[in-house]
């Protein structure tokens, strides 16, 4: 007689996707992806026809870039910088951070920095060839074309430089184009631009990545020639001179004196390259997940670090410090231009500097920044929120301080003030996606999730989730064009964190009107559009997965009464004829599990979607079609949660997966994927399904060889592999208990020797896998019909029944 399993360790299991899945990405804090286009601000020359034409080109190029991004929304899950890749309108005069007017936005100037010139002996020498200066106005594209025409791509000739003068809108600018240096590691061209000498402050103009392909098309040059082997981009400021170097690999130390000179005056790095070098095309690359923490993002294949824009003060005694910046955060006494500059300085100092984040908190800078969120000035709001976003990155204390509005608070202090700050933040977030980076970081803190659910859930659902998803009008996702995709993606990222807040948080989110409906509608739309790898779909499925956790136990009363009433009546009638085996008899279990589900609503609403057949098919479609590991894991995990238990909902979902939707075919394929987390979740789903007596033979026929194949030949050592092996053994145990034929099939697969090896485990300190293997062996010996077959296969009774296996089996009954 087979040994029955228990509802203990080998019973049903559930999962929930919280921020723990991001542990290998360095932090549970999720940062908002930086804006993909750079703001080119200015004020002069508005009537110039050439300028007007350039402005139109800019608008067209930015529109094409946005469309390009929306066409690859199924790309990577980017964890990028929590600071923008540029500094917004930081026009600073020396000494006191006073704001000034910005140049023309349509000039497309690459940069304007002051105090240009080379130092003898510390930088490049005077070029050996020159071009006569051109006095007429030229666009920067024409100027760059003429400069590049003097370069060649030969690597064996000596260093050669071309120097020329150009006038952009009557302002002189110098371009120096060099071919290469004798060192073979420098195989690419570099462009060094010297700004007009009369400029008094460093002013950066970077070309948006979306403009680069258009630029090289206009130059009739091959983009691949200049980008496919580029590797690394260096931009360094030397006494007000900006050097742009396109090199293959890192800059060798022996050339650093020429380009990254440490002169007597302070050097400010404007743009640092990635620390790793790779040959990258300017086109968007494949499905690799960035391994960076903050500060590095991929934009059209180029590796960028954040822009650090600082003022080169003529008086070293007035150098900006954190203390001075925090003291300037007073909207009543300090000009807004200085406040914006001070907030930007804090943003830069707190970027990847945990000491700076802690110092700002100690200086009481966070409450001052929070007060500035109310200032009706776009520059100030952008700078303040950028500073807050960096301050809370990977710093739970700062997150609590931001939300609750004061330092070292308790749960009873500052609630009202915090709510006010949060509401202001939600309003700002709805106006500009930049502010969503702050919300995303805050949502990763377990201490703040409940407060964010209370304060932000309804606003974000009504203003972002419902409009963008197209529900309830029935539009396809993104069809209405009312919102930018990045806004929807980042809001779903916030809700993904919030949905792991615990039972109370899950109940509130399930009750939120329109939330579940919109998430389901969006995911179904992406599947219909053949976009199962859409990155926002991953967030949506993770939210639904979390909301399905402990669903049966947390159902609202009105649903539990209607669903379980029929089940209670059948169970009462069955108890009258229970045999000597009590409620554990097979007859009673089959009657219990064959209880029909109440008729499904044709138009489900809210929580009803979570167990509806349409959503079950949606999960199976994503398992079959998506190549994103987290999407697969969340879909499998949602089904695992829904099949955990023996009530009407788990039983109905299990029958639907196995018998109606051919779900075993898709699930067994997930046992052989490379991602160990996906494999573990697939085994856990099979473990839950195998608890249904009426489905066991079908499951064994479909998946038995696959389950045996994933059991390792040796004792597993990693936690994930131990969990996977234990679930596989418990699944086999469920399938073997009541079926002599299934046990014989297991013997014929040749997997018994592996199970015995794992059962022995680590001697007197067995792990979960060895315990599960011992339980399985003890159950197999209960099939007396197979004793002779075991002996013919050279197995003895002591291989199945011994002190170790008996102890493991009996422990499940206690």
From Swiss-Prot:
Family classification? Belongs to the beta-catenin family.
Question: What biological function has been recorded for the protein in this entry?
Answer: A component of desmosome cell-cell junctions which are required for positive regulation of cellular adhesion. Regulates focal adhesion turnover resulting in changes in focal adhesion size, cell adhesion and cell spreading, potentially via transcriptional modulation of beta-integrins. Required to maintain gingival epithelial barrier function. Important component of the desmosome that is also required for localization of desmosome component proteins such as DSC2, DSG2 and JUP to the desmosome cell-cell junction.
Q: Which organism is it from?
A: Rattus norvegicus
Q: What is this protein called?
A: Plakophilin-2
Name a GO molecular-function annotation. Answer: intermediate filament binding
Entry-linked PROSITE patterns: ARM_REPEAT
Annotated GO CC locations: adherens junction; cell junction; cell tip; cell-cell junction; cytoplasm; desmosome; intercalated disc; intermediate filament
Query: Where is this protein found?
Result: Nucleus; Cell junction, Desmosome; Cell junction; Cytoplasm
Q: Which gene encodes it?
A: Pkp2
Q: Do you know which Pfam families this protein is assigned to?
A: Arm
Listed A to Z, the keywords are: Cell adhesion, Cell junction, Cytoplasm, DNA-binding, Methylation, Nucleus, Phosphoprotein, Repeat
């Amino acid at each position: 007689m087979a040994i029955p399993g228990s509802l203990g360790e080998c019973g049903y299991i559930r999962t929930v996707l919280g921020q723990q899945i991001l542990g290998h990405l360095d932090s549970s804090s999720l940062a908002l992806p930086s804006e993909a286009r750079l703001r080119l601000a200015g004020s002069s020359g508005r009537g110039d026809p050439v300028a007007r034409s350039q402005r139109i080109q800019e608008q067209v190029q930015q529109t094409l870039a946005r469309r390009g991004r929306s066409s690859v929304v199924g790309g990577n899950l980017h964890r990028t910088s929590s600071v923008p890749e540029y500094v917004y309108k930081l026009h600073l005069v020396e000494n006191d951070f006073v704001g000034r007017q910005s140049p023309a936005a349509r000039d497309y100037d690459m940069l304007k920095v002051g105090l240009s010139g080379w130092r003898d002996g510390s930088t490049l020498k005077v070029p050996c060839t020159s071009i006569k200066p051109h006095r007429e106005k030229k666009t920067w594209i024409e100027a760059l074309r003429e400069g590049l025409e003097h370069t060649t791509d030969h690597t064996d000739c000596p260093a050669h430089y071309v120097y020329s003068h150009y006038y952009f809108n009557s302002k002189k600018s110098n371009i120096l184009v060099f071919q290469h240096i004798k060192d073979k590691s420098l195989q690419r061209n570099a462009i060094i631009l010297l700004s007009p000498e009369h400029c008094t402050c460093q002013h950066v103009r970077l070309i948006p990545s979306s403009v680069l392909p258009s630029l090289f098309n206009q130059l009739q040059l091959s983009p691949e020639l200049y980008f496919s082997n580029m590797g690394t981009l260096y931009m360094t400021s030397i006494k007000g001179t900006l050097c742009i170097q396109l090199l293959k690999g890192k800059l060798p130390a022996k050339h650093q004196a020429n380009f990254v000179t440490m002169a007597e005056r302070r050097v400010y790095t404007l743009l640092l390259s990635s620390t790793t070098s790779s040959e990258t095309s300017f086109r968007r690359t494949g499905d690799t997940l960035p391994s960076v923490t903050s500060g590095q993002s991929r934009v059209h294949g180029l590796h960028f670090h954040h822009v650090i824009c600082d003022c080169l003060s003529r008086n070293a005694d007035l150098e900006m410090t954190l203390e001075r910046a925090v003291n300037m955060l007073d909207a009543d006494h300090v000009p807004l231009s200085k406040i914006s500059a001070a907030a930007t300085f804090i943003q830069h100092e707190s970027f990847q500097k945990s000491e700076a984040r802690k110092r700002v908190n100690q200086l009481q800078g966070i409450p001052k920044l929070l007060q500035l969120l109310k200032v009706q000035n776009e520059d100030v709001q952008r700078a303040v929120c950028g500073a807050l976003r960096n301050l809370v990155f990977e710093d739970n204390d700062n997150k609590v301080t931001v939300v609750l509005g004061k330092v070292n608070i308790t749960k009873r202090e500052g609630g009202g003030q915090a709510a006010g700050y949060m509401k202001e933040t939600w309003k700002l977030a709805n106006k500009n996606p930049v502010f969503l980076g702050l919300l995303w970081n805050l949502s990763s803190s377990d201490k703040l999730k409940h407060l964010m659910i209370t304060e932000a859930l309804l606003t974000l659902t009504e203003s972002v989730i419902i409009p963008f998803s197209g529900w309830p009008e029935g539009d396809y996702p993104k069809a209405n064009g009312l919102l930018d995709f990045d806004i929807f993606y980042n809001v779903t990222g916030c809700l993904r964190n919030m949905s792991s807040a615990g039972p109370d948080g899950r109940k509130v989110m399930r009750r939120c009107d329109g939330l579940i409906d919109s998430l389901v509608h969006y995911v179904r739309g992406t599947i219909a559009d053949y976009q199962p790898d859409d990155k926002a779909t991953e967030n949506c499925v993770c939210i639904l997965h979390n909301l399905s956790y402990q669903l049966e136990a947390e159902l609202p009363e009105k649903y539990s009464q209607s669903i379980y009433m029929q089940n209670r009546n059948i169970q009462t009638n069955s108890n009258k004829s229970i045999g000597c085996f009590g409620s554990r008899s097979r007859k009673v279990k089959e009657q219990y599990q064959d209880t029909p589900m109440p008729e499904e609503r044709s138009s489900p609403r809210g929580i009803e979607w979570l167990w509806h057949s349409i959503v079950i098919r949606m999960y199976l479609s994503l398992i079959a079609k998506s190549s994103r590991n987290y999407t697969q894991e969340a879909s499998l995990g949602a089904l695992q949660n829904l099949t955990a238990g023996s009530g009407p909902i788990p039983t109905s979902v299990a029958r639907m997966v196995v018998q109606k939707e051919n779900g075993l075919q898709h699930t067994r394929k997930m046992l052989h994927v490379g991602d160990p987390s996906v494999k573990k979740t697939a085994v856990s789903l099979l473990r839950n399904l195998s608890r249904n007596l009426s489905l066991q033979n079908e499951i064994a026929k479909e998946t038995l060889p696959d389950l045996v194949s994933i059991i390792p030949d040796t004792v597993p050592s990693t936690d994930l592999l131990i969990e996977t092996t234990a679930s596989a053994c418990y699944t086999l145990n469920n399938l073997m208990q009541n079926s002599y034929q299934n046990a014989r099939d297991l013997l014929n697969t040749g997997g018994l020797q592996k199970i015995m090896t794992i059962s022995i485990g680590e001697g007197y300190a067995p792990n979960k896998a060895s315990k599960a293997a011992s339980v399985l062996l003890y159950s197999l010996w209960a099939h007396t019909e197979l004793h002779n077959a075991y002996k013919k296969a050279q197995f003895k009774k002591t291989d199945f029944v011994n002190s170790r296996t008996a102890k493991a089996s009996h422990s499940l009954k206690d």
